[in-house]
Curated annotation (Swiss-Prot):
Name used for this protein in its record: Delta 8-(E)-sphingolipid desaturase
Substrates-to-products reaction catalysed: an N-acylsphing-4-enine + 2 Fe(II)-[cytochrome b5] + O2 + 2 H(+) = a (4E,8E)-4-sphinga-4,8-dienine ceramide + 2 Fe(III)-[cytochrome b5] + 2 H2O
Binding annotation for heme: H42, H65
UniProt record similarity statement: Belongs to the fatty acid desaturase type 1 family.
SUPFAM superfamilies: Cytochrome b5-like heme/steroid binding domain (SSF55856)
Pfam families: Cyt-b5, FA_desaturase
Role description: Delta(8)-fatty-acid desaturase which introduces a double bond at the 8-position in the long-chain base (LCB) of ceramides. Required for the formation of the di-unsaturated sphingoid base (E,E)-sphinga-4,8-dienine during glucosylceramide (GluCer) biosynthesis. Plays an important role in conidiation.
Keywords recorded for this protein, A-Z: Heme, Iron, Lipid metabolism, Membrane, Metal-binding, Oxidoreductase, Sphingolipid metabolism, Transmembrane, Transmembrane helix
Length: 545
């Protein structure tokens, strides 16, 4: 294994050793890619790559990248594999790997590498075949992002985790290799059918209609601003921002022109120049979300401590691999989570202000790529942020509105009107599964298990902006949103053929599901609080160190 060509067959044991040495190895279409030299150039950030180390990332790569980008990836090929690949748990998620010894017996090493990947949670023996199991060995840990809390937790938390896994494994197709391979095959066949039917082709007339709608809202906002009807003007400005987000989302997924740089420019003009939000921040976060959807330790889209928690696992002081910090379940979060089902909508009214903070943190700290094709995006975005605060902060708020009371009213009304988009974003995932079924679960099954769609009439599609088809979007992110309704019929066939449940709720029922989930977690917080009080009174943890 010391020297090999790009087409040389590499053993599982050798690949494991490379990962143990800190290399970033991923599998793509039976090719072994070593992407260490590319990771700092990756436009989507380094985290999304780190979550794919040691895994067959074929479906994730195909879903999120253009044909041209996939072709460029082949430059990092160092070999091939033969036969189906059994995924490792990535180092960033707590995976452990053994260093490679060229003098060791290769056959023995390969077979020993077939054991189940380790789990940072627990050994779910009773859940179902194929669920992650821990195995002990003399492995070297590359990265172990475990909880920093040593405080013991009540047993009901682990019992709840097991219960959720049991429920999901009973509801969804088996996690055995044959079943999951069949799901992958059908998913890839469906992609070919989608391509053949032209559903990846953008309908530019639909975007002309969108542009007319944006212009109408912006024009009405300006009209009423000049009349001095500041509150009405603020409402239409909020509608303008609400609708703009959907096209920025499309551009971020390269779903408009399918050209990376062109769509990036479109997205930055919309998000930064017109909306004051960083497209780069959103892409970095969103790409990770698309790969580790609804995983409490890894998905930034559900990491809203101390205000919201959609899983009891947030009670365990989880360490976020995205933010590289511990999400503490402290006294403040304990209080907030007990009432989160009541505070959900009020807090979302102020959601846009938090996006400003995250955007500036991303740009000031330079968290995006500084090299490669996206090196200049940061500076273009900063220019966009300056432009936004000149036209909105100075031109609208300061120069066009005479009193501070009216200015504050305009500011809050315009921002609160955008709250529905925060509801639409959280609606797709907050009520769905957060159970960890292991690294052998196929990409399409995981996306459908963790994502909800909204059933709405066609005439209301403009209001949801494609977010009503989030499950379908997660399967095929680069499909232009105006084609998602047609794609839905094909995905329904796929779900019937594979036996994967398709979660579809009306907007009202979906909101009820979300509030119900938040209320359930709030109830668990109260139970945990009672457990702690009881244990403290009985001195159960008095000898714990």
């Amino acid at each position: 294994m010391a020297s090999h060509t790009k087409d040389a067959l590499l053993s599982r044991r050798y690949i494991e050793g490379q990962i143990a040495a800190g290399k970033h190895i991923i599998i793509f279409d039976d090719r072994v890619l070593k992407v260490d030299s590319w990771i700092k150039f990756h436009p989507g950030g380094d985290k999304s790559i780190k979550h794919m180390v040691g895994q067959d990332a074929t479906d994730e790569i195909n879903a999120l990248h253009s044909v041209e980008a996939r072709q460029r990836m082949l430059a990092f090929q160092i070999g091939r594999i033969q036969g189906p690949w059994v995924n490792f748990l990535p180092p960033i998620q707590g995976g452990k790997f053994r260093h490679y010894d060229e003098n060791a017996d290769s056959e023995e090493d390969d077979t020993s590498g077939q054991s189940q990947p380790p789990s940072p949670i627990f050994d779910a023996v009773d859940a179902a075949p194929g669920v992650r199991r821990q195995y002990a060995s003399s492995e070297t840990s590359v990265s172990t992002p475990a909880s920093e809390s040593s405080e013991p937790k009540p047993f009901f938390l682990d019992a709840r985790t097991r219960e959720e896994i049991v429920l999901d494994t009973a509801k969804y197709p088996s996690l055995d290799a044959k079943t999951q391979q069949d799901i992958k095959r059908r998913y890839r066949e469906l992609n070919k059918r989608i391509e053949a039917e032209g559903l990846y082709d953008c309908n530019y007339f639909s975007y002309f209609i969108e542009a007319c709608r944006y212009t109408l809202f912006a024009g009405l906002s300006y009209f009423f601003l000049r009349l001095g009807w500041y509150s009405v003007s603020a409402v239409f400005l909020g509608c303008f921002w609400h609708q703009l987000v959907f096209s920025a989302h499309d551009a971020g997924h390269i779903a408009i022109t399918h050209n990376y740089q062109v769509d990036s420019i479109i997205g930055i003009l919309i998000a930064d120049f017109l909306g004051g939000l960083s497209l780069g921040w959103w892409k970095r976060s969103h790409n990770v979300h698309h790969i580790v959807t609804n995983e409490p330790e890894h998905d930034p889209d559900i990491e809203h401590m101390p205000f919201f928690a959609i899983s009891h696992r947030f009670f365990m002081n989880l360490r976020s691999t995205y933010y590289d910090r511990v999400m503490y379940f402290d006294a403040f979060s304990n209080f907030m989570l007990k009432y989160q089902h009541y505070l959900y909508y009020p807090i979302l009214l102020f959601g846009r202000f938090n996006l400003y903070r995250l955007s500036w943190e991303y740009l000031i700290l330079g968290q995006g790529p500084r090299k490669g094709p996206a090196w200049w995006h940061r500076w273009f975005e900063i220019a966009g942020q300056i432009f936004f605060w000149i036209w909105f902060g100075y031109g609208v708020l300061y120069c066009s509105i005479p009193t501070w009371g009216s200015r504050l009213s305009f500011l809050f009304i315009s921002h609160m009107v955008t709250a529905p988009v925060h509801v639409q974003i959280t609606l797709s995932h907050f009520a769905m599964s957060t159970a960890d079924l292991g690294v052998q679960e196929s990409f399409p099954q995981k996306m459908l298990r963790t994502t909800m769609d909204v059933d709405c009439p066609t005439w209301l599609d403009f209001f949801h902006g494609g977010l009503q088809f989030q499950a379908i979007h997660h399967l095929y992110p680069r499909i232009p949103r105006h084609n998602l309704r047609r794609t839905q019929k094909l995905v329904l066939e796929f779900c019937r053929d594979t036996g994967i449940p398709y979660a579809l709720f009306t907007f009202t029922d979906g909101n009820k599901e979300v509030i119900g989930r938040l209320g359930d977690i709030a109830k668990q917080v109260r139970i945990l609080e009672e457990c702690r009080k009881s244990c403290a009174q009985q001195g159960v943890f008095s000898n714990h160190h």
